[in-house]
Amino acid sequence: MNLNFTSPVHPVPAPRPTSFFIEDILLHKPKPLREVPPEHFAGSLASRVPLLDYGYPLMPAPALLAPHPHPALHKPEHHHHHPYFLTTSGVPVPALFPHHAHAELPGKHCRRRKARTVFSDSQLSGLEKRFEIQRYLSTPERVELATALSLSETQVKTWFQNRRMKHKKQLRKSQDDPIHEENREQSSPEPELPEPAAAEPRKGPPGPFLLQDPEDEVDILEEGDILAAPHRL
């Protein structure tokens, strides 16, 4: 038995010729896109991709083991600065002010230095001459000198402080300089030592028969003279 099953043939609609008339263009309206509610999108995303506790999607093992083309974007510190992140519900939420959220607070402002005072030649000459005469000035003297040189009292006080420090450094450097020490030793004369006095000849002890005084001379008589002496008297 020959059974032939033939499927019904549906007529294929002929394609509508394309027209560039304004009426055809206006009549051809695109179908509106169907809006998907966020709850449906979140549920479908959560059902397809499991999420971790802190909101990042858990990728399959092969994807984790394969080298990522952009490893720098998957560093732990990059997730804090990424403008979009996934919450636990799976909905991407844009971060507000991503570049300013983790900006460091500016440090303390550096104290600006005051502008350095530039003295004229006449002012420097007057200050140097006064410094040679007097190293320390009282308040009335500073006011008087500042008025004479068209300066402020603070400028004169600061200049004298700096000049005293410079003078002390110069003295310390000159004392530590070996050439200066050698010149100072050569310039200072050696003290003259007193000449030793000439030694007087030492007199020996007088002998037993040495007469010191002519009045002490005694006539030595012989034995015959001693016997004949009474007859002379």
From Swiss-Prot:
Example of a GO MF term: DNA-binding transcription factor activity, RNA polymerase II-specific
Organism superkingdom: Eukaryota
Q: Which residues bind DNA?
A: 110-170
| Keywords tagged on the record | Activator, DNA-binding, Homeobox, Nucleus, Transcription, Transcription regulation
Basic and acidic residues bias locations: 173-187
Single biological process term from Gene Ontology: cell differentiation
Q: Which residues form the signal peptide?
A: none
InterPro entries in UniProt: HD, HD_metazoa, Homeobox_CS, Homeobox_TF, Homeodomain-like_sf
Ranges for the region named Disordered are 164-218
Q: Where in the cell is it found?
A: Nucleus
What is the disulfide pattern of this chain?
none
Q: Please provide, in alphabetical order, the Gene Ontology terms of the cellular component aspect for this entry.
A: nucleus
Any single Pfam family the record assigns to this protein: Homeodomain
Q: Is this entry keyworded Nucleus?
A: yes
Spell out the SMART domains in the cross-references. Answer: HOX
Q: Which PANTHER family match?
A: BRAIN-SPECIFIC HOMEOBOX, HOMEO BOX HB9 LIKE A-RELATED
Question: What is the similarity comment for this entry?
Answer: Belongs to the distal-less homeobox family.
Role played? DNA binding protein that function as transcriptional activator. May play a role in the determination and function of cell types in the brain.
- Name-wise, this protein is Brain-specific homeobox protein homolog
Its gene is BSX
